[in-house]
Regions:
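Conserved N-terminal catalytic/coupling substructures associated with nucleotide/phosphate chemistry
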Residues: 1-171
Length: 171
């Protein structure tokens, strides 16, 4: 068949390492493919109850990984040598670093692909990826109403029984 690489991972069965592998591919610059029901040599072993397993996989990925992975993965059934296996296609995420929810944004929760394995990220790598995220802060959001003034803001607060002092703090 084919072999494991920095973009392909095989698992004989669904196990507790699913989230780790998915996180590593999300954090990889090219994403990757995870096969369930294939041994380390690329030989198809198969999975029983494909539909149920696909639902479990989707549920675990959606609920156990942050930030949201919606739209970043697809789960399909593939026939290899007339044996049904599950193929999980994972895109490179846009909001890196992705991490396992229960471990947080730490070396225990953030992984990346190195060769044919998923390795924990260093704290420096996590910090670097996080700092590259662009967050919309109030300072970066452009108001659709550019004609507003502080006088109007004072009136707005007065109508609600609040008051702004000279340093624009609410009293």
């Amino acid at each position: 068949m084919f072999q494991e690489s920095n973009r392909i991972e095989f698992k004989v069965e669904l196990n507790d390492k699913l989230e780790k592998e998915v996180v590593a591919f999300l954090n990889n610059k090219e994403g990757g493919i995870l096969y369930i029901g294939v041994d380390d040599n690329g030989k198809p072993i198969g999975v029983s109850d494909v539909d149920s397993m696909q639902l479990k996989i989707a549920d675990r990925i959606k609920n156990n990984i942050l930030p949201s992975t919606l739209g970043l993965f697809d789960i399909v059934t593939e026939e290899i040598e007339n044996i049904s296996v599950i193929k999980i296609l994972i895109s490179s995420g846009l909001e890196k670093p992705y991490y396992i929810k229960k471990h947080g944004m730490s070396p225990n929760g953030c992984f990346t692909r190195m060769g044919t394995s998923s390795q924990p990220m260093s704290t420096a790598m996590i910090d670097s990826l996080y700092s590259k995220r662009t967050h919309n802060t109030l300072r970066n959001i452009t108001s659709p109403r550019q004609d507003l003034t502080f006088a109007q803001l004072k009136i707005y607060y007065q109508e609600r029984g609040l008051e702004l002092n000279e340093s624009l703090q609410i009293r």
